[in-house]
């Protein structure tokens, strides 16, 4: 493994958002000479690596850079730096046009672009004006299927579950308020800067567990009545993990969830609102779902499938360039 100069800069890992300009430079300075194939995976700058003319560069785009394009206004409203938010807003406004020019140019460098969902494929066309192929990301579905965990202690007989970083765009606030209004217990696993504000709107129905070990996440998923997913994601790994656990998903009908959650495995909610999720929770009937069907759906996103599709793309791309 080869690292860049950013490895030695304090806070570059914990607060990487503050170092976007340096990240661009770091990727451009990587020595990638002599390789036949280079595969980059990116949500921002990694697609901007510079390769030899004879090198095939395939870039797996998890999303066009969110804070520059699709979610620019949202990042301005909630930068996520606490007391440094005013400084972050000023910096983003000051640099966004220059950053967009670099980001667009960087997206023209790879020979092949892969999108992690049809939703992202549309964004790639919109912001980068390039065609791409959809290869859904790998989900470790076997981890959630290989063994059944005992029911966690001190949990309600029935409960909704949310597993997420606690940041604004995940919309865990909708899950909390909807469960409180519906009178349905909710367990939230995860940490993040929004925890304090979420606690303020939570009532007796909601438990915040913070970060827990993997085996407990698996257990809570396996025994939940349903998994709540009120945010809009580019793909969304956790809904597939829920399906692999045999647990249906109640998700907002936008983004990657529309490609993973079908009627036979969950509920898609048309509006991203508390009222809409309250209705979905009140009308939800867990007995309508078959765990075997849910797990079969999850297996469509397995590691083996991902490897096979990626190998196919590499072979086809190499053949096309002779």
Label each residue range with its predicted role.
Residues 196-216:
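Nucleotide-activated donor-binding/catalytic signature segment of Leloir-type glycosyltransferases, i.e.
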Residues 222-234, 247:
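Acidic donor-binding loop of glycosyltransferase active sites
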Residues 126, 133, 139-156:
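Acidic anion/phosphate-binding donor-loop and adjacent secondary structure
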Residues 146-170, 176-183, 187:
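Conserved donor-binding/catalytic core segment of Leloir-type glycosyltransferases
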Residues 25, 272, 286-316:
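A charged, aromatic-enriched C-terminal amphipathic alpha-helix characteristic of glycosyltransferases
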